[in-house]
């Protein structure tokens, strides 16, 4: 990527909205925008300015220009943001004129990439911006904001510093074996210090994996016998008639999917074929898929009604759910008395009542949110990472530290330990972007939106 050229891109979606924002960033940002201004050319100073834009003596638009002078901008470069009138034609016309005047169309995520390369943000903050933009639920939104602000990133800096301190102590003991006055350099002291760092990394990994799954979507299978209201549950959850709903048993013969974003978790929903005894070959294939999906799912929504809850087909499903996380949903609850509900609650765990045909699924939504309200990740002020490449790096760091601990506890030569510790330290640097390869950085930022 050329860092010395000037780039342009829409910072807002190009549509028929009233106002659009176009960002120009680079050393020639003022020069290029001034080519479109007849009177009162911009000076390189910070401020807001009302100007008319022209191209070949034709008035294009009247705009507001927000000007930032390097290094005091998001990218660390000269930046001019053009608030123009919206509309697909108008916005694209101004962008094309800016390109003809010397700017280049920015790549996806290039503004954030320039900000990173110019030292305005670190890699965790950059990923936080992307997490914030693509957040599907409140948890992911909170993590994105926290990481974007950099408020929790000092945790990685402290881990790096503490690990470097251990590496240095070990190196002193290797280089000067007769010099044993270095405080905290005994095998016991080093082991204790390493265990503290290892524990911190393990907790970061655990929090991050849980948050990643909650933000990306829990694989959720809706299972049960035929005609108990599974498809109605799916339609009510996603507020869309995605699955066919009829009184004919066995209507759903294949897999129907949808997604819902709740407060603490996103669910990837799968409505499965009803499980029952049948001689229909095609329906049996769907039933086999349903049973396989029970094994694969992170969460199972098991739908029954009061008439069939105890029959043999449902007992088979209960058996399949023995080691699974599931919610028992008694649908068609409008047909149940309060006493009947209370008796079922005494007999079965994790039970809720719904009337999906009436879109009454409040109990179910509340229960799912409660199940995935993890205090450690939802109310934590500690660093949580939800980028897959970030989690992979933390896992590699954990493995390096675990190997180092095993080596030091086994009594092997201390210099062997430093090999894994130094690798772990380098991986921590990579996590925040202190050391990086161009291809890796390019790959990360190309996942961003245009204009970020």
Curated annotation (Swiss-Prot):
GO CC, alphabetical: cytosol
TrmE-type G domain location: 217-373
Top-level taxon of origin: Bacteria
First-level EC class: hydrolase
Pfam families: MMR_HSR1, MnmE_helical, TrmE_N
Binding site for (6S)-5-formyl-5,6,7,8-tetrahydrofolate: 23, 81, 120, 452
Positions with a binding annotation for K(+): 227, 246, 248, 251
Cofactor binding note from Swiss-Prot or TrEMBL: Binds 1 potassium ion per subunit.
Cofactor(s) this protein requires: K(+)
Localization of this protein: Cytoplasm
Residues holding Mg(2+): 231, 252
Keywords assigned by UniProt, alphabetized: Cytoplasm, GTP-binding, Hydrolase, Magnesium, Metal-binding, Nucleotide-binding, Potassium, tRNA processing
Binding site for GTP: 227-232, 246-252, 271-274
EC number: 3.6.-.-
GO BP annotation list: tRNA methylation; tRNA wobble uridine modification
NCBIfam families xref list: mnmE_trmE_thdF, small_GTP
Similarity-based family: Belongs to the TRAFAC class TrmE-Era-EngA-EngB-Septin-like GTPase superfamily. TrmE GTPase family.
Subunit: Homodimer. Heterotetramer of two MnmE and two MnmG subunits.
Protein purpose: Exhibits a very high intrinsic GTPase hydrolysis rate. Involved in the addition of a carboxymethylaminomethyl (cmnm) group at the wobble position (U34) of certain tRNAs, forming tRNA-cmnm(5)s(2)U34.
Protein name listed in UniProt: tRNA modification GTPase MnmE
Lineage: Bacteria, Bacillati, Mycoplasmatota, Mollicutes, Mycoplasmataceae
GN (gene name): mnmE
């Amino acid at each position: 990527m050329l860092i010395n050229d000037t780039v342009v891109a829409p910072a807002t979606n190009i549509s028929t909205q009233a106002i659009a924002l176009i960002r120009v960033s680079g050393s020639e940002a003022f020069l290029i925008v001034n080519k479109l201004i007849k009177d009162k050319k911009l000076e390189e100073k910070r401020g807001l300015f009302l100007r008319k834009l022209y191209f070949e003596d034709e008035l294009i638009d009247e705009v507001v220009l927000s000007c930032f002078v390097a290094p005091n901008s998001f990218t660390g470069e000269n930046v001019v943001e053009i608030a123009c009138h919206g509309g697909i034609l108008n916005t694209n016309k101004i962008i094309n004129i800016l390109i003809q005047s010397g700017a280049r169309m920015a790549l996806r995520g290039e503004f954030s990439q320039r900000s990173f390369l110019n030292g305005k943000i670190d890699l965790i903050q950059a990923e936080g911006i992307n997490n914030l933009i693509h957040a599907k639920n409140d948890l992911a939104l909170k993590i994105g904001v926290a990481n974007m602000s950099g408020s929790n990133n000092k945790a990685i800096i402290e881990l790096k510093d503490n690990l470097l301190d251990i590496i240095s102590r070990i190196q002193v003991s290797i280089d000067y074996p007769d010099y044993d006055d270095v405080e905290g350099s005994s095998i016991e002291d080093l082991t204790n210090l390493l265990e503290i760092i290892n524990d911190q990394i393990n907790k970061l990994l655990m929090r991050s994996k849980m948050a990643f799954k909650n933000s990306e979507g829990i694989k959720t299978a809706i299972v049960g016998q035929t005609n108990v209201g599974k498809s109605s549950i799916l339609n009510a959850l996603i507020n869309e008639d995605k699955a066919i709903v009829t009184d004919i048993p066995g209507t759903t013969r294949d897999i129907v999917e949808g997604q819902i974003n709740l407060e603490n978790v996103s669910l990837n929903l799968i409505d499965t074929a009803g499980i029952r005894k049948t001689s229909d070959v095609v329906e049996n294939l769907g039933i086999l898929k349903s049973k396989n999906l029970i094994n694969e799912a992170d969460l199972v929504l098991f739908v029954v009604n009061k008439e069939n809850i105890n029959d043999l087909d449902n007992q088979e499903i209960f058996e399949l759910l023995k080691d699974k996380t599931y919610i028992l949903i008694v649908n068609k609850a409008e047909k149940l008395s309060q006493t009947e509900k209370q008796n079922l609650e005494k007999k079965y765990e994790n039970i809720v009542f719904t009337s999906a045909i009436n879109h009454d699924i409040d109990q179910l939504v509340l229960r799912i949110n409660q199940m995935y309200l993890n205090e450690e990740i939802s109310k934590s002020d500690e660093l949580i990472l939800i980028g897959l490449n970030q989690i992979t790096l933390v896992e590699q760091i954990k493995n390096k530290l675990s190997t180092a601990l095993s080596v030091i506890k086994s009594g092997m030569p201390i210099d062997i330990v430093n090999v894994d510790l130094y690798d772990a330290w380098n991986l921590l640097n990579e996590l925040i972007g202190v050391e990086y390869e161009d291809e890796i950085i390019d790959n990360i930022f190309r996942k961003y939106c245009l204009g970020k």
